[in-house]
């Protein structure tokens, strides 16, 4: 693993805001931003639903674990993980040991409102997507809590407010933040 600047990893269910908030925090910190799902799609050359269709969820999780291993081995990044990244113990261990983990927590109802029209979420292509989100929340919430250094509730705050909450929690936890760099000035974001 590279050494140097600390890493910041976002976990939470699909639709919790990991990519949106993560990208905003990365810009404020002047860190490169990565989304493990986007990186996996770029690496494979196909969208995640295609991976699910051809390899099933287990095949996707194998590829996801390899991507998590690679990305968490870097230094000074902000990473938004896929919602199911915490399902594998090895992923949880890598996240916990290689960075600070933020759990963006949202209620199943809020998640459903945010994801109900999104056809790129294979696990929600079901008769009862809201029920599926409730089941996923019940199964995964304890795993997110297990790896999280802190939890941010995403219900009402705006993206900017959530980013500020994350930065304040990081600072209170001793995360090395260059306060001049953590201003609202945009940074170059070369990663999707």
Curated annotation (Swiss-Prot):
EC number: 2.7.1.71
Keyword Magnesium carried by entry: yes
Chemical reaction(s) catalysed: shikimate + ATP = 3-phosphoshikimate + ADP + H(+)
Keywords, ordered alphabetically: Amino-acid biosynthesis, Aromatic amino acid biosynthesis, ATP-binding, Cytoplasm, Kinase, Magnesium, Metal-binding, Nucleotide-binding, Transferase
InterPro entries according to UniProt: P-loop_NTPase, Shikimate/glucono_kinase, Shikimate_kinase/TSH1, Shikimate_kinase_CS
Binding site for ATP: 15-20, 121
GO BP term, pick one: amino acid biosynthetic process
Pathway entry: Metabolic intermediate biosynthesis; chorismate biosynthesis; chorismate from D-erythrose 4-phosphate and phosphoenolpyruvate: step 5/7
Residues binding substrate: 37, 61, 83, 140
Protein encoded by which gene: aroK
CDD domains: SK
Enzyme class: transferase
UniProt source species: Cupriavidus pinatubonensis (strain JMP 134 / LMG 1197) (Cupriavidus necator (strain JMP 134))
Family: Belongs to the shikimate kinase family.
Assembly description: Monomer.
Function as written in the Swiss-Prot or TrEMBL entry: Catalyzes the specific phosphorylation of the 3-hydroxyl group of shikimic acid using ATP as a cosubstrate.
Cofactor binding comment, as recorded: Binds 1 Mg(2+) ion per subunit.
Protein name: Shikimate kinase
Cited PANTHER family: SHIKIMATE KINASE, SHIKIMATE KINASE 1, CHLOROPLASTIC
């Amino acid at each position: 693993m590279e050494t140097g600047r600390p890493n910041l990893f976002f976990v939470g269910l699909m639709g919790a805001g990991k990519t949106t908030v993560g990208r905003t925090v990365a810009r404020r910190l002047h860190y490169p931003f990565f989304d493990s799902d986007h990186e996996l799609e770029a690496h494979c050359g196909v969208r995640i639903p295609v991976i699910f269709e051809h390899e099933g969820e287990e095949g996707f999780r194998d590829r996801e674990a390899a991507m998590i291993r690679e990305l968490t081995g870097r230094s000074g990044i902000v990473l938004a993980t896929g919602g199911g990244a915490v399902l594998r113990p090895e992923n949880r261990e890598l996240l916990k040991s290689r960075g600070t983990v933020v759990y963006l927590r949202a209620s199943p109802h809020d998640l459903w409102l945010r994801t109900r029209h999104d056809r790129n979420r294979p696990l929600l292509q079901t008769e009862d997507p809201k029920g599926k989100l409730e089941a996923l929340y019940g199964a995964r919430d304890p795993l997110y809590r297990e790896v999280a250094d802190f939890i941010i509730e995403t219900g009402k705050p705006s993206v900017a407010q959530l980013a500020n909450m994350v930065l304040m929690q990081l600072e209170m936890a001793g995360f090395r933040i260059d306060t001049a760099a953590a201003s609202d000035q945009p940074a170059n974001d070369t990663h999707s």
